[in-house]
Amino acid sequence: MVKPCWRIGAGMERSKINPTKVDGLTWYKDLGLHTFGEFSMAMIQANSVMEDQCQIESGPLTFNNPTVQGTFVGVYDGHGGPEASRFIADNIFPKLKKFASEGREISEQVISKAFAETDKDFLKTVTKQWPTNPQMASVGSCCLAGVICNGLVYIANTGDSRAVLGRSERGGVRAVQLSVEHNANLESARQELWSLHPNDPTILVMKHRLWRVKGVIQVTRSIGDAYLKRAEFNREPLLPKFRLPEHFTKPILSADPSVTITRLSPQDEFIILASDGLWEHLSNQEAVDIVHNSPRQGIARRLLKAALKEAAKKREMRYSDLTEIHPGVRRHFHDDITVIVVYLNPHPVKTNSWASPLSIRGGYPMHSTS
C-alpha cells in the first residue's frame, strides 16, 4: 500500500478554517490570502521520494523595517534527491530577510545574495557530509523565487522552472513569461556555456537527442550540484556516472539567478510559478487561459490535472489509469510537479489593512510501501 507522508515544515500555517490537505500523492491548499490577494498551491509526487519543495511567505520582508511588506514565493525542483530543495526551503527566505534588513529594502542585489549564500552554505554541508554521504555532491535543485513588493514583482531563477504572468487584454488574457530559464536545450543557455568555456569541447554533449552539460545534466544553473562546481568532489567515492574524466579548474554550473523586475499594472491578474513538470505538458498560454477561465478555488490542482491529462494522452492511456500508478514507476510518465498561482490585486493593500503574516511550506513527503 502506498503511504505518502507529508511533514509540515517549521512555521507552516495550520489554519483549521483553510488548512493544507493531502489526497493520495497530491498536497494542496486550494485558496489562501497573501498580502496582495489570494493564492492557490498544489504539488504531486512522481518520484519514489518527492524532490520538489515550495513555500509562500507573506508579511514583513525585513527584520527592521515594518513598511517593507510583501509576498515571497518559492518553487524548488530538486534532482538527484530531495536534500538540496529542502535546504533551499529552510534557508533562502531567512537569508533574503537578512540581506533586505541590511539595505532596508528589497532589490535585485538582495535576492541574488540570498541565492549565492544559500548555495554556498549547501556546499559547506556537502563538504561536511562527504566522508559519510559522498552522493550529496550529486544532489541539486532548480530555484525559482518571486517577490511582490511596492508594486513590483521580482522573479529570480536558476534552472528551468518558470513564472508566467496573466495580463488582461481585449476580453481575454495574454501570457507574459517573467522568468529566464537555464536549460542546455535552449540556444541562449548553450551560447552562454560555450562563451564561458571556449576551450572545453565537451562542455555540452548531445545525449539521447537532448543537450546535457558534460553529458550528465540539462540545467546550466542550479543550487547544489557540488560535483560540477568544485573539482574536489570529482573523485571516488562519488558514483562513476557523476565523475568527469577530465579535471576542471572553474565551476561548470553557476548558482547566479537571472532576475527580472516588472512593474505591475491593473491589467495584471495573476502569476503562475511552477516546476518544469507542468510546462512539459502545458504551454504558457494554455496555463493562463485555464486560470483566467476557472474559479479561483482549487485552481492549482486544476492545472495539475490538466498537465496529467496531457501526460496520459501522450502515452495513449486514460487519465484514471495514470493516477493509479505508484511513485517511482510513475516518474516514467511525468515528473514531480509543483504549481503556485498568485492572484494580484490591482491596487496594493493599504498599510493598516495588511493580512496577518503567513508561512506555508509544501513538500517533505517520505514515501514508503508496505
Swiss-Prot record:
GO molecular function: metal ion binding; phosphatase activity; protein serine/threonine phosphatase activity
UniProt-annotated binding residues for Mn(2+) 1: D77, G78
GO cellular component: cytoplasm; plasma membrane
Domain PPM-type phosphatase residues, every copy: 35-344
Swiss-Prot/TrEMBL GO biological process terms: negative regulation of leaf senescence
Manner of cofactor binding, per the entry note: Binds 2 magnesium or manganese ions per subunit.
Keywords annotated in UniProt: Cell membrane, Hydrolase, Magnesium, Manganese, Membrane, Metal-binding, Protein phosphatase
Coiled-coil segments on the chain, per record: none
This enzyme's EC code(s): 3.1.3.16
Membrane topology: Peripheral membrane protein
Entry annotated with the keyword Magnesium: yes
Protein localization: Cell membrane
Annotated Mn(2+) 2 binding sites: D77, D276, D335
Entry cofactors: Mg(2+); Mn(2+)
Assembly and binders: Interacts with SAUR19. Interacts with AHA2 at the plasma membrane.
Stated family: Belongs to the PP2C family.
General function of this protein: Dephosphorylates and represses plasma membrane H(+)-ATPases (PM H(+)-ATPases, e.g. AHA1 and AHA2), thus influencing negatively plant growth and fitness. Promotes the apical hook maintenance of etiolated seedlings.
Descriptive protein name: Probable protein phosphatase 2C 67
Protein's organism: Arabidopsis thaliana (Mouse-ear cress)
Lineage of source species: Eukaryota, Viridiplantae, Streptophyta, Embryophyta, Tracheophyta
